[in-house]
């Protein structure tokens, strides 16, 4: 044994054990690679990613913290998502939630022409912490 050495058991580490999982097929319809990190609210991921968006509400990728999944243009992958835990409040990302995760706030667009499902306008939170930064679009 060397000074400072850590010896760990040779067993698999179970990530997100006990969380409800959702499996989705995702396709990158864009012309650029898209990478989604481990704790990104998948519902708010890049609009060029085509998937059943309403099923991703309140969920993140079921991968180790700090990891990411990369979608090259035209890639189709199956991903597993798990629900956020804790206080179940989301702020930031694309600013579509900015508050508690409440499935009643989401609906699927009725017409087939719509590319994505959205949070009903009356349920959106207008205060976005990102708007107060020095960043102007």
Swiss-Prot record:
Residues 126-137 have a biased composition (Polar residues). InterPro entries: Urease_beta-like (IPR002019), Urease_betasu_sf (IPR036461), Urease_subunit (IPR050069). Pfam families: Urease_beta (PF00699). One of its GO terms (cellular component) is urease complex. SUPFAM superfamilies: Urease, beta-subunit. GO terms for molecular function: urease activity. Its EC number is 3.5.1.5. Gene3D superfamilies: Urease, beta subunit. Its main location: cytoplasm. It is found in: Cytoplasm. Residues 118-137 are annotated as: Disordered. Keywords: Cytoplasm, Hydrolase. Belongs to the urease beta subunit family. This is Urease subunit beta. It comes from Staphylococcus xylosus.
């Amino acid at each position: 044994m060397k000074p400072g050495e850590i010896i760990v058991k040779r067993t698999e580490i179970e990530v997100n054990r006990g969380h409800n999982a959702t499996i989705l097929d995702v396709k990158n319809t864009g012309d650029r690679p898209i990478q989604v990190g481990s704790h990104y609210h998948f519902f708010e991921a890049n609009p060029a990613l085509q998937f059943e968006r309403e099923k991703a509400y309140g969920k993140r990728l079921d991968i180790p913290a700090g990891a990411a999944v990369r979608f090259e243009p035209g890639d189709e992958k199956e991903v597993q998502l798990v629900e956020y835990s804790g206080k179940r409040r989301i702020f930031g990302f694309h600013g579509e939630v900015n508050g508690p995760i409440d499935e009643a706030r989401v609906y699927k667009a009725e017409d087939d022409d719509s590319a994505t499902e959205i949070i009903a306008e009356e349920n959106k939170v207008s205060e976005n912490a990102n708007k107060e930064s020095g960043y102007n679009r």
